UniProtKB/Swiss-Prot annotation:
Pathway: Protein modification; protein ubiquitination. GO terms for molecular function: molecular adaptor activity. The modification Phosphoserine is found at residues 51, 60, 202, 286, 313, 341, 343, 355, 362, 373, 377, 547, 555, 686, 688, 916. The modification Phosphotyrosine is found at residue 571. The gene is ANAPC1. Keywords: Cell cycle, Cell division, Dwarfism, Ectodermal dysplasia, Hypotrichosis, Mitosis, Phosphoprotein, Repeat, Ubl conjugation pathway. PC repeats lie at residues 1297-1325, 1366-1404, 1467-1501, 1520-1552. GO terms for cellular component: anaphase-promoting complex; cytosol; nucleoplasm. This is Anaphase-promoting complex subunit 1. One of its GO terms (biological process) is protein K48-linked ubiquitination. It comes from Homo sapiens (Human). Phosphorylated. Phosphorylation on Ser-355 occurs specifically during mitosis. Belongs to the APC1 family. Residues 323-343, 384-394 have a biased composition (Low complexity).
Amino acid sequence: MSNFYEERTTMIAARDLQEFVPFGRDHCKHHPNALNLQLRQLQPASELWSSDGAAGLVGSLQEVTIHEKQKESWQLRKGVSEIGEDVDYDEELYVAGNMVIWSKGSKSQALAVYKAFTVDSPVQQALWCDFIISQDKSEKAYSSNEVEKCICILQSSCINMHSIEGKDYIASLPFQVANVWPTKYGLLFERSASSHEVPPGSPREPLPTMFSMLHPLDEITPLVCKSGSLFGSSRVQYVVDHAMKIVFLNTDPSIVMTYDAVQNVHSVWTLRRVKSEEENVVLKFSEQGGTPQNVATSSSLTAHLRSLSKGDSPVTSPFQNYSSIHSQSRSTSSPSLHSRSPSISNMAALSRAHSPALGVHSFSGVQRFNISSHNQSPKRHSISHSPNSNSNGSFLAPETEPIVPELCIDHLWTETITNIREKNSQASKVFITSDLCGQKFLCFLVESQLQLRCVKFQESNDKTQLIFGSVTNIPAKDAAPVEKIDTMLVLEGSGNLVLYTGVVRVGKVFIPGLPAPSLTMSNTMPRPSTPLDGVSTPKPLSKLLGSLDEVVLLSPVPELRDSSKLHDSLYNEDCTFQQLGTYIHSIRDPVHNRVTLELSNGSMVRITIPEIATSELVQTCLQAIKFILPKEIAVQMLVKWYNVHSAPGGPSYHSEWNLFVTCLMNMMGYNTDRLAWTRNFDFEGSLSPVIAPKKARPSETGSDDDWEYLLNSDYHQNVESHLLNRSLCLSPSEASQMKDEDFSQNLSLDSSTLLFTHIPAIFFVLHLVYEELKLNTLMGEGICSLVELLVQLARDLKLGPYVDHYYRDYPTLVRTTGQVCTIDPGQTGFMHHPSFFTSEPPSIYQWVSSCLKGEGMPPYPYLPGICERSRLVVLSIALYILGDESLVSDESSQYLTRITIAPQKLQVEQEENRFSFRHSTSVSSLAERLVVWMTNVGFTLRDLETLPFGIALPIRDAIYHCREQPASDWPEAVCLLIGRQDLSKQACEGNLPKGKSVLSSDVPSGTETEEEDDGMNDMNHEVMSLIWSEDLRVQDVRRLLQSAHPVRVNVVQYPELSDHEFIEEKENRLLQLCQRTMALPVGRGMFTLFSYHPVPTEPLPIPKLNLTGRAPPRNTTVDLNSGNIDVPPNMTSWASFHNGVAAGLKIAPASQIDSAWIVYNKPKHAELANEYAGFLMALGLNGHLTKLATLNIHDYLTKGHEMTSIGLLLGVSAAKLGTMDMSITRLLSIHIPALLPPTSTELDVPHNVQVAAVVGIGLVYQGTAHRHTAEVLLAEIGRPPGPEMEYCTDRESYSLAAGLALGMVCLGHGSNLIGMSDLNVPEQLYQYMVGGHRRFQTGMHREKHKSPSYQIKEGDTINVDVTCPGATLALAMIYLKTNNRSIADWLRAPDTMYLLDFVKPEFLLLRTLARCLILWDDILPNSKWVDSNVPQIIRENSISLSEIELPCSEDLNLETLSQAHVYIIAGACLSLGFRFAGSENLSAFNCLHKFAKDFMTYLSAPNASVTGPHNLETCLSVVLLSLAMVMAGSGNLKVLQLCRFLHMKTGGEMNYGFHLAHHMALGLLFLGGGRYSLSTSNSSIAALLCALYPHFPAHSTDNRYHLQALRHLYVLAAEPRLLVPVDVDTNTPCYALLEVTYKGTQWYEQTKEELMAPTLLPELHLLKQIKVKGPRYWELLIDLSKGTQHLKSILSKDGVLYVKLRAGQLSYKEDPMGWQSLLAQTVANRNSEARAFKPETISAFTSDPALLSFAEYFCKPTVNMGQKQEILDLFSSVLYECVTQETPEMLPAYIAMDQAIRRLGRREMSETSELWQIKLVLEFFSSRSHQERLQNHPKRGLFMNSEFLPVVKCTIDNTLDQWLQVGGDMCVHAYLSGQPLEESQLSMLACFLVYHSVPAPQHLPPIGLEGSTSFAELLFKFKQLKMPVRALLRLAPLLLGNPQPMVM
């Protein structure tokens, strides 16, 4: 019988049995695919998947060939999660035919298809692989780089890779692949051996057989191998041995296992990157070209890749080589090679040449692996075979270049060769497993020998290599690792499933529902029908444990049978099984702790192997015990426990602890059946006595024992404590005391058990676990369970101080007397007392208390990896209270002692990585240091909440400190810990990719549908309504800028007008109004700049340009197309272009846009082509055009549509600003004849496209001072007209464009133009500006300019009218901000009448502007400075425009003077606009506003005709633009009024150009809806000069002086500068007060300014810091002296700055003056604070739901609950305190303290932990470090109420003193003198001892208390015990023999 019993008990029950069918199989049938039709035709499904017993085809991963019927295969892995997320589900990759199906489980839902792929040819293999995207190719870089997770699908000729992000790659394979493996670095390929390569006698050198590919875009390179030889030297060579097959590859550690088919041995190699010296060896070696003999000396591994040598190739075209690559090899080899290789088309060969990761010369890897007997090294071919292929520049590769190998394998271990090595003993399955103590084994299954070979390996001490140990053989038919619990499942030949840990056998696995095969062979007994028949009773558990010893053998092979017989008997056993029915055929797909079993009938089941322990307490204790025991014993201990725990019908969660205690104590030698507190353990955890297992009955008649048993059961305790029982007043039926004396005689320990010698060590680590659990408030129940075990052990080990320690913690649980088990004194010698064992119990509370009191403490012992909280608490107290900063950077031994028995390298290493202190974050104070350090070690708010409140207090205090003034650059985790959600959300948003904005405005649908879309619906109205809250100016702007509605044509019909004439009159009026309508889109583009995130599936809406009108009173339509009046041709073409630009500029730069979407927006109708051209230009300006495919750009340009070319060229140039991008340069050069070689074909490029291309060159080369470009552009400014009418019209705009482009190329370089001195740039420009003789054209374009134009007779002088503007602005830009006086003097306005007559007045504007821009620092924002630019002669003689009579003087030309005057003033104003652009400078605004008003007055003056209205309008427009630049984005009301006034003027001189200027001014004023402003960087000024060029077009098609498209370049000067505070709780924009600090400059000192956000910030380079000011919001500081990157990223993401409202405060919207805030109210009635506070008002000042509910339920009286008013008042005042001091997290601490004091008053303290916490709180507030902090920060808010703590202290003192007076003194005396105590007094005594820090009685006798006569003597004696005086005062009466206690 016993035999059978043991067989049963060592069974391990598997759980969760489920039938398994691969998910992909089912999905395949429904997946749309031609192949699943074939699947249906093959056979019925049931037949299809069944297989005969031996073959096991299901899921086989053998090579699939096309001729066989379709096979399936699949693999499973653990679900891959995000960092920090714990997942427990499977992912499956299923392959059948051409399909690959990837499915995933999830925590919450069923398995679902994640991705399915269908490829063109049958899939040979599919696998997961992570590629590393790294610039740095070193080994170290691997940890930090981003990983691209891919799925790879191998077909016969190529491999497809699909990344999770959706990128697809395809790589053609240059050889037939036998197998592909994922590695840590990428993919590893094994080449198939072609038939002729196998004979070893072949004289030709073999090719490499293994190759690697590190990224889908990298090349396939050969693998190198480094094998150590006998003499210590090692060789490096290619892997060429065909006999060497990879059988296993692992990523961590990165090792490869190979099998040598010739020698029949397995070897292990480490896989790593090639070192550079190894590269050189291989490459040099291969270039020497040695003969095969001297190569063959180094074993069979020598190998070199071949490639075609030049002489071989009869083919001249480089591309033919690729397709006919094998044609040469036919001569040297059998044709079969050719037939086996995949044929690869030219396109495939070339496809990888375009990949960005490759050089110019690598077309494909294909030709390089070809065979040729000439050359020894892999070479790359040059592209051309001509003799001078390398002479024509560096564009081509050097003639041959070897392939550089990337990975290398290093030999680690080879199995020893035995004599009887069988053929084909290749491992069929290999895996790595570790045992329960973390020792690692590499296991490989040799199926032919039915053996599992396990090799132990470990890392060397320096972590550089792996050391392999001995091999252990386990007989096995199949095996699989169970990673989760560090074990492996082995299927024995007999069909048994056995669990091993490492090589130690744990036990058989019992699978419910499957017959156990072992019964037929080992037992003749019939098996019970159900597995749960024989439930073991509690009594024989110790027997059960004893019997385990015999079964758990350390030897892996059962000694019951002879191993030789084992092999013989296998087959006949199998026969017996088949008669029995199904048996297990194989094991596969292990994930976590789940495996699939394949059964003999073809079905599969998936089972779960139970975990080692489910309850946290048992897990922690097991970890601690495992940590302290020697490895062998630890494994045995865990195996025993696992067998008990996992037996069929194992324990429930509740009773697991009881089982653990029993098991552990039995292993220590206890007889748990005889021990009072363990004998009645309930192993079921049930509440019903019926189900509770009874003891085995000794007799039929029954006895009193049954009743005793019931009374002692847990069930009885449960019932007894039940409320019903109390209410019925049933007297407790006591169990008759288990006659203790019966037991106590013979309760001794059995010293022969496994753990007997280790009892002290186990006791000590369990004590440390106990102290650790005290730091987790959620583990209270576990502590009570653990303390019972510890007390028993402490008593038996006679450790008095420990028993006393537990008594003080749990006075009711720990009786001072109890059952003691004797340990034979003879045996105690065998006990191992470890060195770390201390006689004084380590106490974490005591340690913290001593630190707070400033006493020295010994280091606290801790278990690495187990007692992490203790470690954290100790170090944080040391840092914050003791102020020791060194410990965060290094492990400090002065506070902690790490307990070790063996050097556990692994754990230590992990720790040091975890606790490293990252110095990236800026910290100043100790509090900040503590918080940042705690975050770095992974401490979170949740951890803080589970710490007891007294221990957590110092940490909370530090957090409170940091919360006040945190740094803005702290990482998200720190901000979360200190409770600043505003900052953590900011940090979190900061990490997000630029996606849809936070403040995206959801436009309510239906608002715009009935009316036409005006292109302005997508603005963020929420923010705009905050910026301009007082009025409706935004609606007004929208009305002024809309062009989608018909205009009102108001014409009065005079009597003399006929109807026909009246219609003409109306249409003429409409034509006038249309000039204005066509000018609106430019301004609208400015207003809506970057305000919209398009939906990628919808086209961009472009509003209509409506040129019709409505005439009142009947609203009749007026149309220009009626034919009554002449309308200019192409009138609307540029207006449409601007409309397209405006629509495109709405798109924000952060939008998700791709090439397809851009093409998708292309209109169907030709008339919309102009709009699309504008749209393309806009996409360039916001940076999206770079995504447009080159092919599409080419398509658009070849269409020859002029506008599209202009838009595209300007767009791509703006997108590539300043990059000197070669491809764009080529694109532009085609359109600029001057950049083409002189002999090239003359292309017919439209003039405007040339202008756009020239400006484009300027943009692409901006600021580069590129000599050739500058030279060409300089010449182009003065390019003369040609003979055949080319370059004869609109020359001015081309010359200007060349000047602007030259200025951009040399932007701000001034006189530092390196290498251009011979060009004389400034002199040449000066000549262009003032005129003179034309210089002779030099260089290659000389020919072009020989014959002059036949139309334009300029002679050989420069036409200044053409060249002056461009040259002037070029000078301005080259010398921008250089303050170069000499150049500026060239630009001074002429000061004599004679000279004035030589200069067009318009050019004086440009000269003045240029001069001021050069003398940047001299510009002053006042009218005096503006006037100072006007020469004296003009100032003195200029007429005042308001005068009636004109002074007459013959010499002076009044017209010239007055025109010169206004233009110079306008030029100075414009420069003022540039200087203060976007600054909202008040002086500049006032000055410019005054001049604008003046010009408006001049216009209506009687003698305006002298100056000319057109000139005055121009100057007014220029001044208005300057004003708008200064106030850009601010929406200033006065400027808006000016713009609105000018909008209404439509007649007379008001042409298209002036309207354009006025509406651009309006757009600038509301730039980007108030979110953008202008920058004054050099680049911005260049862009603004192009956009605001002060010569406006006369009509809508006028591009003579300036190309209209350039007006949109202002975008390059716009930058986001709006800061929008967003309330983090409501997520809505709000007002907040900012304090902005300006850096000091030469004009002003460092100053501070207060702004109410949302507001536009000044330019960031002017600022020092920005601060969100209190008191309403939490303060927040952004320090710009550390760099502006942080703020720039905030501004670019819509400027969202999260802010958090402080408690008791209302937002500025609700309470503008701050009179309603809570603090304002309390100041008014300060005297009755707590009473004045009504709980109802709390909702006004906090949004925390927990606080609101607290106020609702705890602070208001409720019916029938009878709470005392006193408690309600207390709660209300505490709540008020917490909320006003911003410490809501302290509320639980306040309440816990109050509850503890009340419990103490009722004398119901069953445990003293809360009293400890109160004691720690009081000690913290009286600690020295805290007092110092208060002195340093007197203004700091109080962290805990100063009135609350003294009351607490006083109440406790009173309660304990009262207890002393009513008999407590006798109790204390009895305790100190070691006499027995009264049961009822135990808990109060413990409270007294803890609170007053009374030492244990063991410490008292040496002092001799009784002899003391005076208090002074006592004081002296107690000094060394560090006992507080207040405690001594209470003890003195007892010790001095005075009965009256002294109460103070």
